[in-house]
Design a protein with these regions (language model features):
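Cys-dependent protein tyrosine phosphatase-like superfamily
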Residues: 1-145, 157-212
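Ser/Thr-glycine-rich phosphate-binding loops at phosphate-binding pockets of nucleotides
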Residues: 150, 154-155
Length: 212
């Protein structure tokens, strides 16, 4: 599973989520990519992305996140970027930041994320960009890139929906979703998330809650 992960320096959780067996065959590799945001992409990261020949990018973030964390793009970038004009998360922040409000322990963090996942499929702007995502997959003849802020919750939901739609086995769907917990430099990613959460809500959240 880990060989799906591309070794980028400034982009978290960049990986290929194709290659799985389906009801009618197998998803192609080199066509379906997912990641976190690209605001910290290095020049070598951008060169690698350019070599993937990505035709469409689906940005699951809302307006607030896209303004705070503008993505860097390769030279001669020509991919079409699809997004919803509005907020795809309830507070305008990424789901893991939204869920962190009034959370101090791992148990509270888990309960908050369960509540958040129950709400995500019914958020109008997220549903809007998911429609764009599936439309892009139906129309595209090249590679697509799916991303949000952390490349975890909204991106994980969208990738899992695609996998289930085409008949990827549930065990593979779950394994791909959970690969986020191992992809790339986890400690660095957790540290970045902790900094953002504590900057928004103060230092009360313990380390176990951050990792939940």
């Amino acid at each position: 599973m880990r060989d799906r992960v591309l070794p980028l320096q400034g982009i978290h959780n960049f990986r290929d989520y194709g290659g799985y067996s389906t009801r009618g065959g197998k998803l192609r590799t080199g066509r379906l990519f997912r990641s976190g945001q690209h605001v910290d992409a290095t020049p070598s990261d951008l060169d690698l992305i350019a070599a993937l020949n990505i035709e469409k990018i689906v940005d699951l973030r809302g307006n607030h996140e896209r303004t705070l964390y503008p993505c860097l793009r390769p030279r001669e970038f020509s991919a079409e970027v699809l997004f919803a004009d509005g907020e795809t998360a309830g507070s305008g922040n990424a789901p893991h930041i939204e869920a962190a409000r009034d959370v101090a322990t791992a148990e509270q963090a888990h309960a908050a994320m369960v509540r958040l996942y129950a709400l995500m499929p019914f958020r109008p702007k997220l549903v809007e960009v998911l429609r764009l995502y599936f439309g892009a997959l139906a129309e595209s003849t090249g590679a697509t890139l799916l991303h949000c802020l952390a490349g975890k919750d909204r991106t994980g939901l969208a990738a899992a929906l695609l996998h289930r739609l085409v008949g990827v086995h549930q065990d593979d769907v779950m394994a791909d979703y959970l690969l986020t917990n191992e992809a790339g430099n986890m400690e660095r990613r957790i540290a970045a998330g902790a900094e953002t959460v504590r900057a928004n809500f103060g230092p009360a959240m313990d380390d176990a809650a951050i990792r939940t």
